[in-house]
Amino acid sequence: NKAKNFINLTNIDFLGVSIGNVHMFSKGNYNPQLDLLSRINEIVEIPLVIHGTTGFPEDKIDLAIKNGVAMFQVGTIIKETFFNEIKKNIQNIKIIDNVHDYVGSRKEKDFLEPGKSKIIDLISKYINLFHSNNKKNLYGK
């Protein structure tokens, strides 16, 4: 009932819920309280949001969606993936003849490009996991 009262008081469009998820979680997995999510979804009439999706079990995502989750906030795993790939690649640079080739050039030597490629793959995976692909027709465009 606190959730419903909060929604009525603030007139928000989405509700971020705490069901065992941890914002900026980075190590291991957690067990989301899907029974609590289900109860919240029965009470409120707006879409729910999960902050702290890193560590959310992939096999529970469909159930979370069925229980009202319309948005998953994924940041930590994307940042870690990008950072780790850059760290790995920057260690391979021995001689820098032209710094511009290595930073932001989008050329073969650019140490940022492998990180970018890794997060594109990761984000594509999440788009499919969250069933967020092929939604353009929902917006009449």
Sequence positions of predicted segments:
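Short beta-strand/loop segments at the ligand-binding rim of alpha/beta enzyme cores
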Residues: 42-52
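Alpha/beta enzyme core
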Residues: 1-44, 58-69, 74, 87-88, ...
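Extended, intrinsically disordered, low-complexity segments
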Residues: 91-141
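A hydrophobic, small-residue-rich beta->alpha segment in the mid-to-C-terminal subdomain
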Residues: 68-99
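Conserved short-loop catalytic and cofactor-binding motifs
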Residues: 24-28, 52, 107-114
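A near-ubiquitous, low-amplitude feature marking generic local secondary-structure context
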Residues: 23, 47, 69, 102-109
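Short, ordered loop/turn segments at secondary-structure junctions
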Residues: 20, 52-53, 77-79
